[in-house]
UniProtKB/Swiss-Prot annotation:
Gene name, Swiss-Prot/TrEMBL: rsmH
EC class name: transferase
E.C. designation(s): 2.1.1.199
Protein species of origin: Deinococcus radiodurans (strain ATCC 13939 / DSM 20539 / JCM 16871 / CCUG 27074 / LMG 4051 / NBRC 15346 / NCIMB 9279 / VKM B-1422 / R1)
Intracellular or extracellular location(s): Cytoplasm
Protein family: Belongs to the methyltransferase superfamily. RsmH family.
Stated name of the protein: Ribosomal RNA small subunit methyltransferase H
Keywords: Cytoplasm, Methyltransferase, rRNA processing, S-adenosyl-L-methionine, Transferase
Region (Disordered): 1-24, 288-312
Reaction catalyzed: cytidine(1402) in 16S rRNA + S-adenosyl-L-methionine = N(4)-methylcytidine(1402) in 16S rRNA + S-adenosyl-L-homocysteine + H(+)
Gene Ontology process terms (BP): rRNA base methylation
Length: 312
């Protein structure tokens, strides 16, 4: 990998998870070996997992003796983490964009590393009732925290121009105007309330649809990002991380699409505090991509805060 050598070697994800967690609360983390190499967890070190989710990455850190403050806004993820009672894990409710307030409130002012795994956890995607998937019938929700407007509110309330702009900006969907027009026409007949209902509308709008990437993928991505203000949270979280890292501390960010990766890349290049350790994003090995298809689009970038001068 194109990254500075960590103080500790990589660890087998399966070995670490079996040592650190019960089987009832499981999640397969992407780029597991690369995260351990980048953050070098060890006894006495303190880390933040800003996107706790299924705690897959947190287990990797805990398994090497580190302390982890896990942040999540999803009540379901928080409940599962508390029930798992993982030794060394402190669970904080909130959005990682607010970690500069959440951590001091928990008595933490500096940490050795911060991990952000942006996007939706696998267990959230697999929970049909959350409304993230276009494959399964469910209420059109997509909210991480269950507060604020839902995806159904968005598709039924925004005008056609606003919808098209949203789908294009956050989904990079070239057929955004046509999709927005079909959505508006459909909701004039009946409110759009479910995932499959919306997916079928998009499928009808998509010209020349054939087997392959589902035509609803980019629109669903756009709605999820908009509903949860994911890009705004990422920008705020990156800025907050700068002030929390101890000298020599590292920030590791896993993104899953180009919008996020561009934000992370530009932030690290423009930071006066952090030095990028990855000239190019680290991607999953072919073997991991075969075993875990969700790893195919994962990109890891790492930055480091300068170490304190000797004698200081």
């Amino acid at each position: 990998m194109n990254i500075m050598t960590a103080n500790q070697g990589a660890v087998s994800p399966s070995q670490t998870e079996s040592e650190a967690s019960p089987p009832t609360f499981s999640h397969v983390p992407v780029l597991a070996t690369e995260i351990v190499e980048a953050l070098a967890p060890a006894p006495g070190k303190v880390f933040v997992d800003g996107t706790l989710g299924g705690a897959g990455h947190t287990r990797l850190l805990l398994g090497r003796g580190a302390t982890v403050y896990g942040i999540d806004q999803d009540p379901y993820a928080l409940d599962r983490a508390r029930q798992a009672a993982l030794p060394g894990l402190h669970v904080l409710q909130g959005n990682y964009r607010d970690m500069a307030e959440l951590l001091p409130a928990a008595g933490v002012t500096q940490v050795d590393g911060i991990l952000l795994d942006i996007g939706v956890s696998s267990f959230q995607l697999d929970d049909a009732g959350r409304g993230f998937s276009y494959h399964t019938e469910a209420p059109l929700d997509m909210r991480m925290s269950q507060s604020g407007e839902s995806a159904a509110d968005v598709v039924n309330d925004l005008d056609e121009t606003e919808l098209a702009a949203l789908i294009y900006e956050y989904g990079e969907e070239r057929h955004s105007r046509r999709i927005a027009r079909f959505i508006v026409q459909a909701r004039e007949k009946a409110p759009i309330e479910t995932t499959v209902q919306l997916a079928e509308i998009i499928k009808r709008a998509y010209p020349g649809f054939s087997k392959g990437i589902h035509p609803a993928r980019r629109t669903f991505q756009a709605l999820r990002i908009y509903v949860n203000d994911e890009l705004g949270a990422l920008r705020d979280g990156l800025s907050a991380a700068e002030g929390l890292l101890a000298p020599g501390g590292r920030l590791a960010v896993i993104s899953f699409h180009s919008l996020e990766d561009r934000i992370v890349k530009r932030f690290l290049l423009g930071s006066d505090v952090l030095t990028p350790l990855t000239k190019r994003p680290i991607v999953a090995a072919e073997s991991e991509q075969v075993d875990n298809p969700r790893a195919r689009s994962a990109k890891l970038r790492v930055g480091e805060r300068a170490a304190a001068p000797e004698g200081s």
